[in-house]
Amino acid sequence: DNQGDKVPDLKVRAVFEALRYVYVSNHQILGGSWGMHVIVPLVHQSLDTPIPGIDDGKTFGLGDITINPLIIGWHLSPEWHITAGLDIGLPTGKYDSADPTDSIGANYFSFEPVVAFTYLAKSGFEASAKLMYNIKTKNDDTNYQSGDEFHVDYLIGQHFGPWSAGLGGYYLRQTTDDEVNGKPVGSDGNRGKVFAVGPAIKYDYKNMSFMGSW
């Protein structure tokens, strides 16, 4: 719940396969390389809930696609790299306000400024962090406005030829209230916060990378 306590007998399981296409051009903007990306998620989701009126269920399908038409990367040295851009979330995933078990998408647009830092030593050691601030539009089906969120993805790992392995995770904190019909939800605006860490592995093959994390 929003106090960080477990909800008894509530279980949500989700597995994502995110297909990310990245294009980096030879054009320069503000001294950095211009590129773009598209992220297409496929989602396997199951829900077991004790909440009255909501049935257990499973679903699979296309999630909400993310596009970023403007990514700028600066390579300050062989070790230090910085990128900045604006991710735009599109409500492409299936959604049914009357059936949460069959809903994969969020049913709103999101706009997320992104700044990422990477340190990659000659020894293969890597430390990376990606800072984001997520701003959402209102879900018109429910008249629910989710609050803004600040979050950080991080990774510490080691490269071994085409392989790399390490620890990765994220920290998220909601900075503004959730609202329904223009009024805050509950006494605390239903503000959430999450911290997660787990193993991560990546394999690079030609112009492709395969990543897994838990």
Describe the predicted segments one by one.
Residues 4-68:
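Long, hydrophobic/aromatic-enriched structural stretches that serve as scaffold segments
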Residues 2-6, 47-54, 84, 94-102, ...:
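Outer-membrane beta-barrel translocator domains and adjoining extracellular loop/strand segments
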Residues 18-25, 67-73, 86, 113-119, ...:
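Residues on the lipid-exposed face of transmembrane beta-strands in outer-membrane beta-barrel proteins
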